[in-house]
Regions:
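Beta-propeller folds
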Residues: 1-181
Length: 181
């Protein structure tokens, strides 16, 4: 009978989703807390200034509301601190091999042949108006050594979600205007 055992003492980072995926060759690709991650960012003892939000769309569109959004630069720093991960290959003998650079990795899936990774990362600017699934996103195919083989998509921040005629939400990228016809 086989038994379960710990492969690595390193801490997994599951802040943005499932931290591990099988490679198919008796190894895992996992998101780890970066080994050089420092202490949690500390808030300034007094506010730096007011937080002002302004709507400049020029129209009275309906807007979705969301709970638990980032509210300040300190929230941004906390989010980046805890969401930043280092991808690594973990063999069944416990060897951990880093893959690429650390970043805000929201997903990493191993290809069926175990040779490639589909990696989704988030980047700044963050928003105080929409949740993280609307933050700037890059989807890339990585080789197992972390080399970017191909960028499949780069999506900018989507701060405005318009409502279509059928009541469906339609994402509008920052700087883009909703076509009126």
């Amino acid at each position: 009978a086989k038994s379960a055992r710990q492969l690595s003492a390193r801490r997994l980072n599951a802040v943005l989703g499932a931290p591990c995926d099988w490679t198919g060759d008796e190894a895992l690709v996992c998101t780890f807390v970066p080994q050089d991650r420092g202490a949690e960012p500390v808030a300034a003892p007094t506010p730096v200034g007011p937080i002002v939000q302004q709507t400049l769309t020029g129209s009275a569109d309906r807007a979705a509301t969301y709970q638990d959004l980032l509210k300040s630069p300190h929230d941004e720093a906390i989010f980046a601190h805890y969401a930043t991960s280092q991808l690594a290959r973990v063999s069944l003998d416990g060897a951990v091999t880093p893959i690429g650079a650390a970043g805000i990795i929201s997903g990493a899936t191993v290809s069926p042949d175990g040779q490639w990774l589909l990696v989704t990362t988030l980047s700044r600017p963050f928003s105080y108006s929409v949740p993280l699934n609307f933050f700037p996103t890059r989807i890339e195919v990585w080789a197992m050594d972390g080399r970017v083989a191909r960028t499949l998509a780069t999506r900018p921040l989507i701060e405005r979600v318009a409502w279509g005629g059928d009541g469906a939400q339609v994402p509008v990228a920052r700087g883009a205007e909703l076509g009126r016809g």
